[in-house]
């Protein structure tokens, strides 16, 4: 009985750990998002070759976030990070209209991956501070998000440098993951 009560208490009040994979095309702002969430500040970044992994605490959830480089030549390595992923944060450069089709193709391939079939999908429509940025509604259309079935998804307009929208996205993700367990 003591073990049952302990597990119940932990589930109700304790920290829950979630494995999150953050991906997107190169230059979308993934690393800036990660360190804005982790440190609360903008750091100077260089293109990620490989990955960064950090734990981000939000409310009573401890997100282990894997930020994986987005260059074309290393995207084939992403599949090595899929196992046990509970949520995907797909970061899109809202200002890069020339690559939104490429982002859609990459995302659609990932949606077809069996190991990600139960993952919640959060799309960060990043760089909303730029004057020519596509709105979240426009990105929803261009990525074909309305065609996603049998899994939760959400799009959040963000600006990684100011932090705008990041915690709203984490709020949705934490609620989505809580509801799926």
From Swiss-Prot:
Matching InterPro entries: Arf1-5-like (IPR045872), P-loop_NTPase (IPR027417), Small_GTP-bd (IPR005225), Small_GTPase_ARF (IPR024156), Small_GTPase_ARF/SAR (IPR006689)
Enzyme class label: hydrolase
Disruption phenotype: Increases phosphatidylserine levels in the outer leaflet of the cell membrane. Simultaneous knockout of DRS2 results in inviability.
Binding positions (GTP): 25-32, 48, 70, 126-129, 160-161
Any Gene Ontology biological process: regulation of Golgi organization
Keyword Magnesium (UniProt): no
A Pfam family annotated for this UniProt entry: Arf
Record keywords, A-Z: ER-Golgi transport, Golgi apparatus, GTP-binding, Hydrolase, Isopeptide bond, Lipoprotein, Myristate, Nucleotide-binding, Protein transport, Transport, Ubl conjugation
UniProt xrefs under CDD domains: Arf1_5_like
GO molecular function, one term: GTP binding
N-myristoyl glycine lipid modification positions: 2
GO cellular component annotations of the record: cytoplasm; cytosol; Golgi apparatus; organelle membrane contact site; plasma membrane
Subcellular location: Golgi apparatus
Main location: Golgi
The protein's Enzyme Commission number: 3.6.5.2
UniProt KW GTP-binding keyword: yes
Catalysed reaction equations from the record: GTP + H2O = GDP + phosphate + H(+)
Cross-link (Glycyl lysine isopeptide (Lys-Gly) (interchain with G-Cter in ubiquitin)): 127
Function: GTP-binding protein involved in Golgi vesicle trafficking. May modulate vesicle budding and uncoating within the Golgi apparatus. May recruit the lipid transfer protein VPS13 to Golgi membranes. Recruits polyadenylate-binding protein PAB1 to COPI vesicles, and this is required for correct localization of the asymmetrically distributed ASH1 mRNA.
Assembly mode: Interacts with RUD3. Interacts with VPS13 (via C-terminal part); the interaction is direct.
Note: Present with 19300 molecules/cell in log phase SD medium.
Family named by the database record: Belongs to the small GTPase superfamily. Arf family.
Protein name: ADP-ribosylation factor 1
Organism: Saccharomyces cerevisiae (strain ATCC 204508 / S288c) (Baker's yeast)
